[in-house]
Amino acid sequence: MRGLRRDHVRLMVVDRARRKITHSRFDRIGGFLRDRDLLVVNSSRTLPAALPATRADGTTIQIRPCVRRPGHWDALAVEPEPPFANVALRAGETLRIGQVMTARVAGRRPDIPLLWRLEVSRDGLAEMEALGEPIRYSYVPQPVALDFYQNVYAGRAGSAEMPSAGRPFSHQLLGSLRGSGVGTAEILLHTGLSSFQDDAFDAEHHLYEEWFEIDATAAAAINQAPRVVAVGTTVVRALESAAAADGKIHPVLDWTSLAIRAGTPIRAVDALITGLHEPTASHLDLLRAFVAEPLLMRAYEDAIENRYLWHEFGDSMLIV
């Protein structure tokens, strides 16, 4: 995307104990990790989740599923081209997706009214494979191949958008880190949408549920690790949802609606690798649980001054 190897993006290291900010490159992250650190990654694979749908009058819109359950989706309806403006649907109308799939509009989701409750005739995975494309926003002006939205360790497909904190890891870098004593464990959390395509609405930081899984092998590795380094806020949400009062992780398959904000006790995660997002994004709510406000704002001022890039193809931050 940027003419760089994925592990050559910039890396900002925020040391909370020393209140120090260091600028580096992602492939040098091993210099800031320790022997026996455990990287916990989200192995969910990104779906080509942006689907064309046809209304009864023949117009085409795009459906972006946020929460997928058997028989129904909570989804955004937008115009099919940038800037992907929201489209108002009518309760009772039926959308056609491909040749055989239909989606009947039941109405708006009460707690997140920009999402539409769709009663779907199929799970939509075949339609995504045949017709879908990765969800993108106006800062990505042209369609991008799905491979660019995948982490190298991605496994089972299910995320509406890429768990992007892991994108800078290459196979070579992961191998080098393992050789220096840094371990890895995989959990799974299927992401929803990062934006509802309405700045004022996004600023209200509406929360929705996401499906996550932590198996016994991952739970044991996490519980034994001297330092747990979460690769992404999705991993933080999963681990903190699964953590008992003493911080121990138990195997789980469940939905989580956990909100993590300033003052939320962090019981299972010791350090965090994350992408950079605009200072108004809900992403920063979670970071405030890790980093005191003055240091976090200084880090973001540094990022702006040094022209760090935002979003899923941008630069990275390590909080230790």
List where the protein language model places each region.
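A cross-family signal for N-terminal binding/gating loops and helix N-caps
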Residues: 1-320
